[in-house]
Amino acid sequence: MHLGTRLLLSGVALVASTRTFAAVPPPAPYGPVPTARQLQWQEMEFIGFAHFTVDTFTGKEWGYGDESETVFNPTAFDAGQIARVARQAGMKELILTCKHHDGFCLWPSSFTDHSVKNSPWREGHGDVVKEISRACRKEGLKFGIYLSPWDRHSAVYGTPAYITYYRRQLTELLTGYGPISEVWFDGANGGDGFYGGARETRAIDNKTYYDWPNTIALVRRWQPMACIFSDAGPDIRWVGNERGVAGDPCWQTLNRRDFSPGNADSARLNRGDRPGTDWLPAECDVSIRPGWFYHPNEDGAVKTPAQLLDLYFQSVGRGATLLLNIPPDQRGQIHPPDAAALLEFARRREAIFSRDLARRARATASNVRGRARRYRAENVIDGRRDTYWATDDGVTNADLILKFPRPVTFNVARLREFPPLGQRVEGFVLQQWQDGQWKDFAGGASIGHCRLARGADVTTDKVRLRVTQAPVCPAISEIGLFYEKKD
């Protein structure tokens, strides 16, 4: 059973268990709460993007739509290598650009000739989507699809006929390639393009043209557990930039009614809304290279492992998910410097998070809900995500102390709330006991799914989490302490 499903069932069971444990009921959920598919998506934390199309061979970032199908001809395509590198990097999912703005399809679609079936690759019998999806399953990765709503090749783009065409292609992808875990709807749409030879500029009303409710219903029909990404969700929101950086705070909630795909208030998307009407966690997209597609002249500009680790702390560490683009090269493989950076990035994360120093401690709290074992302080260091420390209703400011039998040295901390009960904490500080007094190590407003903090080396035998602001009693699932060796 997926952790996300287990967390959701745990939350449901806790609420249902009030009949048996009437004296100590669980906290009531606060505000919007995640669905099972959102919980499964959030638990991945780090996923990959593979931008690959004719642009890989033309040097463009946005193809005009007039590119010949013969341009697409990877010399040594290896879906297994791509998926293997993604898995070795620690990614849990890989999203493929099945069709980018240029309109070229990486699968032999029945509804256009502008696809791999008219390319020289595999003598016109290839299917990139099939090979990547199968390689992902072999490597234990989930598979996601990107299908650009904007199509600069299609002669009917901007007319009602295009919506039928788009949904037919979407249905091909949703029904022909096994389980899909994420469907990615880009906000870029409308502008100049080839458009079947018209070579003109076309504008659409991006609030109404795509009829998103019916397209979303199509995804729900064929892939009910797939999370849908766009500026407005309904499951995942854009973080508001392509730098991979979430706001601080980055609330898990947003007033979704204020947004639609292609209509982005970047500042609000970056930070979320508090309070918010919808559970809509952020996804931080960024490329390992300056561009989204592979270009040989960028081989010397691949992000370093240190830069990738910084991005991890600025995305996952603020409650979002990191979506890192790893574009295949003109061979059809992850280029060597990219792969090397990814593997070293994975090694550094493992070196930090494989050893949780907090597990050595004894935990006590200023208040435990009903003095019940199921809400005890020790739950934050038990290594489980389906248990938590909670306080009595009305106790919204509380302390939890970790006491160590001997001093430990740490410089990284990780905090987690219990998402099935909503995002509850609005202010916290993490402190260490030094020189006879409590000193601040980290603090902020949001914790949510995950909060990471880095600081100077600290040696102490006591650490204290203070919840300083919350509208309801807190529910904290984890306090972790780690040590990062500096270069």
Q: Where do the PLM segments sit?
A:
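Noncatalytic modules at the cell exterior or secretory-pathway interfaces
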Residues: 456-468
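Sec-dependent N-terminal signal peptides
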Residues: 10-13
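Mature catalytic domains of secreted/periplasmic carbohydrate-active enzymes
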Residues: 23-381, 387-396, 401-402, 409, ...
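Short beta-strand-to-coil "C-cap" segments at the C-terminal boundary of structured domains/repeats
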Residues: 478-487
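Bacterial N-terminal signal peptides that target proteins for export
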Residues: 1-8
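Short beta-strand elements bearing conserved aromatic residues within extracellular beta-rich modules
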Residues: 428-430
